[in-house]
From Swiss-Prot:
CDD domains, A to Z: GluRS_core
Gene: gltX
Top-level division of the source organism's lineage: Bacteria
Protein name according to UniProt: Glutamate--tRNA ligase
Family matches, as SUPFAM superfamilies: An anticodon-binding domain of class I aminoacyl-tRNA synthetases, Nucleotidylyl transferase
Principal location listed in the UniProt entry: cytoplasm
Location of the motif 'KMSKS' region: 239-243
Subunit structure: Monomer.
Keywords: Aminoacyl-tRNA synthetase, ATP-binding, Cytoplasm, Ligase, Nucleotide-binding, Protein biosynthesis
InterPro entries: aa-tRNA-synth_I_cd-bd, aa-tRNA-synth_I_codon-bd_sub2, aa-tRNA-synth_I_CS, aa_tRNA-synth_I_cd-bd_sf, Glu-tRNA-ligase_bac/mito, Glu/Gln-tRNA-synth, Glu/Gln-tRNA-synth_Ib_cat-dom, GluQ/Sye
Motif ('HIGH' region): 9-19
Residue positions binding ATP: 242
Family to which this protein belongs: Belongs to the class-I aminoacyl-tRNA synthetase family. Glutamate--tRNA ligase type 1 subfamily.
One of the GO BP terms on file: glutamyl-tRNA aminoacylation
Species in which this protein is naturally found: Blochmanniella pennsylvanica (strain BPEN)
Amino acid sequence: MNIKTRFAPSPTGSIHIGNIRTALYSWLFARKQGGKFLLRIEDSDLQRSIDDTVELIVAGMRWLSLDWDEGPYFQTNRFSRYNSIISYMIQHDMAYKCYCSSERLESLRSNQIKNGEKPKYDGYCRFKSTDIYSSSISSYVVRFCNPQDGVVIFHDQIRGTITFNNKELDDLIIRRADGSPTYNFCVVIDDMDMQITHIIRGEEHINNTPRQINILKALRAPIPTYAHVSMILDNNLKKLSKRCGTLGIMQYRNDGFLPEAILNYLVRLGWSHGDQEIFSIEEMIKYFDLSRISKSPSILNLEKLLWLNHYYINHLPIDYVASHLSWHMHQQKINIQNGPKLTDIIKLFARRSRTLKEIVNNCLYFYIDFDLFDNKVAKDYLKPVAITPLKFLRKKFSNIVDWTPEIIKSIIIETVNEFNTSIDKIGMPLRVALTGTNCSPTLSITIHAIGQSRVLERIDQAIRYIST
């Protein structure tokens, strides 16, 4: 069998990590089996589709390096195909036109609920000649002739055997009154035409599965293998919302997460391989198995994701991390030519940072000069008593020929001894003068990275601030 999976998001909002986990599982399964992975945009619902969302979906997949072998396909480009199949089904008594008014359907629903029955269409137009309507009513939908007896049985790769009674299913609308085909129909024709062998998707689609299988059987098409993944819950144990902007996958990029951390976190969010926590992409492909996906819901844990991101910031090749950091610096409009190499910045901040955004926010003083000391830190440390030590340090720094962290450190220690004081009394005013903050990496290394000329200028600036 030639394995083929698909990721088929609807462009009705930002794709969140639940969607991406489904894409990852489908991608991993295809890659492990030597099959193909397809990207399809299910945009048949014209009223709910958002144009910009498609770009976000593609950008998110590319950022995560979840490459596809076919696509992206768009359902809106396939309407003629859907309509030709619907016409065929009507001609062969697999589907029929339904002229029932909204008033009749609402009355039917109300009565069924009142009588304690499950609301569903009663097949009224299925058993009536449409000739009596065609001349007086132009608006109609098309419904699929669902089997009225028997059961639908399928083996879910995660949940085992699932059975539905056909009596519980009504005749599904496959084309709306406006002429547009419905989701449950389009997805069946797409999977049939694109020869999808394995459908990995969220558990919210379980109830769609028997309807889709019945359509496939009517068309005498192969039935794919299904695997329905449990939902992801937020910290309040509520289902993730697709329209919650903070959960959009690209928001995680904006917040400073590496794609490797996202993928590692998501693969473990419902799947396991022993006690192993850290997985390379190659290991994910090697070990991935649908049977090891849990049936239970997973809970989003930001602290775990931050822990993984910290791990990857510190363990991935430094040039690779620097390439991602460069993107964040560009987003902040920071000229990276105006300061140390990004690899040096990573060496300084990686151990203490859980996101790339933290690194950016903490390293600004290496690239952007500041001219105001109006914060509490400056008032606490840049006092008249600091002027003389700062002048002493400035003179020593200006005479350095070989600008190295070791020589800088020796001058700081010399200054401490010269003024017979503590390292904090010298180091903190110097740190604030050079960085504008009371928190930085090791002072001598920080000073070295800032650069000699900039250090001298900032000490002069601090002395002027204290003197005014």
